[in-house]
Amino acid sequence: MPSPLRTAPQPPLRAFHNPPALRRLYSSTSHSAATPATSPFAPRHLLSIADLTPTEFATLVRNASSHKRAIKSGSIPQSLHGALSGKTVAMMFSKRSTRTRISTEGAVVQMGGHPMFLGKDDIQLGVNESLYDTAVVVSSMVECIVARVGKHADVADLAKHSTKPVINALCDSYHPLQAIADFQTISEHFAASGKGKLEGLGLNGLKIAWVGDANNVLFDMAISARKMGVDVAVATPKGYEIPKEMLEIIEKAGEGVKSPGKLVQTNVPEEAVKGADVLVTDTWVSMGQEEEAAKRLRDFAGFQITSELAKRGGAKEGWRFMHCLPRHPEEVADEVFYGHRSLVFPEAENRLWAAISALEGFVVNKGKIE
């Protein structure tokens, strides 16, 4: 009878499954040149409109409108047909949402993919494991991560370590998908058909008046406007102005632009709306600011957008109104919100087309925006 086969002693299970090379690669304290974050094959992410050239931003807006027209007419563009077939997109939302979730999940489905929603009860960034570990593991199993988080540092860390594209669906500093939808809405309403260079969307010289809190939606809107040659006047109560570091980012967004949009700030709503084509506001109390609600409501008294404010301040005769939603009555009067000047509901719908355009550019086309 032959003797039993003898095998060489095996290393401990932990060492076998975690060899030195992998320990170096996935260490949370040391990242060599071989890590996904610094690899020459690292994906391109959309964290802010500041990440885009003027031409790229205008292209995303134009593609959103083009896909909207085609799909609504019953013709799915060839570039989108089954573009995400067999692919999973992780929807990592640590903040609740209505429009963002419906629009991004709907966009993935329209393109043939599978959206996997991971809410705050499913995954808590940086709580049970490091953001590094989460980014590496999740990105190894999906085609893209769409992240709606609290802090910009969280989505930036996800992108730094993800091997797949990360699209920022909102953080405390930026909201790029909203900016694409906003400029799609403005372009569809104001731009002369077939006129204007690609970089400008035909909107050069337009003026936006923002009346309310200086927040993430405003920041990406102002960055976009600077790139597109659109002027922005911001009216906030004292103490609620755009932070200095964000002003520097907005200023830098105009570099290389022939006629960048101008940004001015005031504490007087009437001064901001003078000569404005579009009046915009947003919530005065964002998620996470609930304890400040009473003080904020007092501080923002007099900043409600009304027809009387527009008339008193001298907005242009054909002015229009926008709001990213959800809306509260203290921010804008019913007469404006539900009136003929409101672009609010087309703006909300355009979130779907903006998401489709972004997924096409950053996931399907690997960051090549064309």
Curated annotation (Swiss-Prot):
Which positions does UniProt annotate for carbamoyl phosphate binding? 97-100, 148, 175, 178, 324-325, 351
Q: Does this entry carry the keyword Hydrolase?
A: no
Q: Where is the transit peptide?
A: 1-38
Please report a single Pfam family linked to this protein. OTCace_N
Q: Where is the active site?
A: 324 (proton acceptor)
What InterPro entries does the entry give? Asp/Orn_carbamoyltranf_P-bd, Asp/Orn_carbamoylTrfase, Asp/Orn_carbamoylTrfase_sf, Asp_carbamoyltransf_Asp/Orn-bd, Orn/put_carbamltrans
Per the UniProt entry, the Enzyme Commission number(s) are 2.1.3.3
Localization, per the record, is: Mitochondrion matrix
UniProt keywords, alphabetically: Amino-acid biosynthesis, Arginine biosynthesis, Mitochondrion, Transferase, Transit peptide
Q: Which GO terms describe its cellular component?
A: mitochondrial matrix
Which reaction does this enzyme catalyse, per its entry? carbamoyl phosphate + L-ornithine = L-citrulline + phosphate + H(+)
Identify the pathway.
Answer: Amino-acid biosynthesis; L-arginine biosynthesis; L-arginine from L-ornithine and carbamoyl phosphate: step 1/3
Q: Does the keyword Cell membrane apply?
A: no
Q: Main site of residence?
A: mitochondrion
* Biological process according to GO: arginine biosynthetic process via ornithine; citrulline biosynthetic process; L-arginine biosynthetic process
Gene Ontology molecular function: any one? ornithine carbamoyltransferase activity
What domain of life? Eukaryota
Query: Which residues does the record give as L-ornithine binding sites?
Result: 216, 282, 286-287
Which principal EC class is assigned to this enzyme?
transferase
Q: Which PANTHER family match?
A: ORNITHINE CARBAMOYLTRANSFERASE, MITOCHONDRIAL, ORNITHINE TRANSCARBAMYLASE, MITOCHONDRIAL
Q: Do you know which NCBIfam families this protein is assigned to? A: orni_carb_tr, PRK00779.1
Task: Report quaternary structure and partners.
Answer: Homotrimer.
Q: What family is this?
A: Belongs to the aspartate/ornithine carbamoyltransferase superfamily. OTCase family.
| Name the record gives this protein | Ornithine carbamoyltransferase, mitochondrial
**The species this protein was found in:** Aspergillus niger
Designated gene of the protein = argB
